[in-house]
């Protein structure tokens, strides 16, 4: 889906640049749906009319997603992460309520920058508040970079011909060697489970898929490459009304490992922060049990002893 054509004959794939540009480059014929409600964004997201074989026009409303409701658990996690983000940091914000909770805790920061996969309402709010300026970025200074957008109608209007925002293909935004050129890159992403070694299951639980492969591991590695960078994997300590611990001895068989133990840095729950990078198996296990829900710590400790980790 593309924006209306500009005076130079270009359409903008602003809301979903991601893989679309690569598909267009390889397509024998390009058919565009041109929607009058799609913003015209800047960046490497434009298709010239000469490349288009056919098009159809529509004015259907664009799918909207507002900011999620933030409860005390999400708020606590957000505060832990926000306290570790310095002024001038460049941020990658993943999808979900907890990353959004982090954004809401950043209103007292100064001169933050954005190099991310998804741009949403939380980022727009910080721009409007003067918190995000991109002034101290040393890679694409002055510009926010993203590959797709998901939010409200206000966000889509904010994107329209905004010189501070550029939309690029996902192989550009998510390249760890490019994103990692930002000093102080702080990557914030959610997961469903973390095991004693720090492996994260963000896409499936066992053989049941819940999400596709996103940019989590890309940006964890980018933050590891960044001078002063940090990556945060965030999750509530429990699921299903406190009946299941999300800190587990091992991931279920069949679980897709989204972030591996050798890449993980910080894991954050409402009970604190576990710093895992460079730590031994015993130290990782102790740190993760320390941020598990108190009702499960004894059980997890016994499991760790049986696994000869403690």
Question: Predicted segments — roles?
Answer:
Residues 1-310:
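Conserved phosphate- and dinucleotide-binding cores of soluble alpha/beta proteins
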């Amino acid at each position: 889906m593309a924006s209306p054509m500009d005076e130079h004959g270009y359409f903008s794939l602003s809301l979903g640049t991601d893989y679309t540009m690569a598909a267009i480059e390889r397509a024998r014929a390009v058919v565009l749906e041109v929607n009058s409600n799609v913003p015209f964004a800047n960046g490497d997201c434009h298709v010239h009319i000469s490349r288009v074989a056919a098009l159809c026009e529509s004015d259907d409303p664009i799918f909207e997603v507002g900011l999620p409701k933030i409860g005390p658990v999400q708020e606590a996690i957000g505060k832990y992460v926000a306290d570790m983000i310095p002024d001038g940091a460049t941020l990658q914000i993943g999808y979900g309520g907890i990353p959004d909770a982090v954004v809401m805790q950043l209103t007292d920061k100064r001169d933050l920058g954005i190099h991310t996969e998804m741009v949403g309402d939380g980022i727009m709010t910080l721009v409007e508040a003067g918190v995000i300026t991109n002034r101290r970025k040393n890679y694409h200074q002055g510009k926010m970079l993203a590959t797709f957008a998901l939010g409200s109608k206000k966000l889509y209007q904010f994107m329209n011909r905004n010189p501070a925002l550029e939309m690029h293909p996902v192989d550009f935004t998510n390249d760890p060697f490019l994103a990692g050129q930002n000093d102080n890159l702080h990557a914030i992403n959610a997961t469903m489970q973390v095991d004693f070694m720090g492996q994260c299951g963000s896409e499936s639980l066992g053989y049941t898929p819940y999400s596709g492969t996103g940019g989590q591991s890309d940006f964890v590695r980018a933050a590891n490459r960044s001078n002063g960078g940090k990556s945060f994997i965030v999750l509530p300590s429990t699921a299903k009304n406190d009946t299941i611990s999300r800190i587990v001895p091992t991931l279920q068989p069949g679980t897709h490992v989204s972030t591996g133990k050798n890449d993980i840095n910080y894991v954050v729950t409402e009970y604190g922060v576990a710093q895992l990078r460079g730590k031994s198996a015993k130290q990782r296990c102790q740190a993760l049990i320390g941020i598990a829900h108190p009702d499960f710590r004894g059980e997890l400790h016994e499991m760790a002893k049986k696994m000869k980790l403690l």
